[in-house]
């Protein structure tokens, strides 16, 4: 999947281009596969692996908090199935703000998802995380819970919810995607 890096905010766009180039200089090809993500796409990812009860409870919580657009995003995408991939609700991932990028490692022309496999003594995801931090990005592979090796983001704050109120997030998502 081609990712349009121009959809990322200016402050991260050049940095992630440098990140990919720096990895390449170390013999590691990293290819972008997720940049800007709509809150509807985030809702699909969050819903997979969760029970109906958990989903209904979270929709109710969002409505009670006055975050009607976020609740609508979560409710409107319908049932989703799959392994857990995120704890971030719609609006609560930096992807929705254009401040995060996911890349996969390319080995012999194929996507390689292993975080332990080494080629020429290097694991692509570990190189990617190291290089990201050299550029003052936050690397998801170094998180303590639900490690997300393909993910890098501009801010150190793990979530927009750490620096914005739920109402600010709801308003921001409605303005961008509503």
Q: Which stretches of residues belong to each language-model region?
A:
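Cell-envelope/glycan interface and biosynthesis
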Residues: 1-166, 170-178
């Amino acid at each position: 999947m081609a990712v349009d890096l121009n959809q990322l905010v200016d402050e991260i766009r050049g940095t992630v281009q440098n990140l990919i180039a720096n990895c390449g200089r170390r013999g590691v090809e990293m290819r972008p596969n997720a940049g800007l993500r709509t809150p509807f796409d985030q809702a699909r990812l969050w819903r997979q692996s969760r029970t109906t009860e958990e989903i209904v409870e979270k929709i109710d919580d969002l409505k009670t908090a006055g975050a009607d657009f976020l609740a609508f995003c979560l409710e409107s995408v319908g049932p989703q199935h799959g392994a857990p991939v995120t704890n971030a609700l719609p609006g609560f991932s930096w992807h929705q703000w254009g401040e995060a990028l996911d890349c996969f490692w390319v080995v012999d022309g194929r996507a390689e998802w292993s975080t332990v496999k080494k080629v020429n003594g290097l694991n692509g995801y570990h190189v990617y995380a190291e290089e990201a931090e050299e550029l003052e990005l936050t690397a998801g592979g170094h998180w303590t819970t639900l490690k997300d090796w393909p993910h890098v983001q501009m801010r150190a704050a793990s979530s927009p919810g750490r620096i914005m109120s739920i109402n600010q997030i709801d308003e921001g998502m409605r303005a961008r995607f509503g």
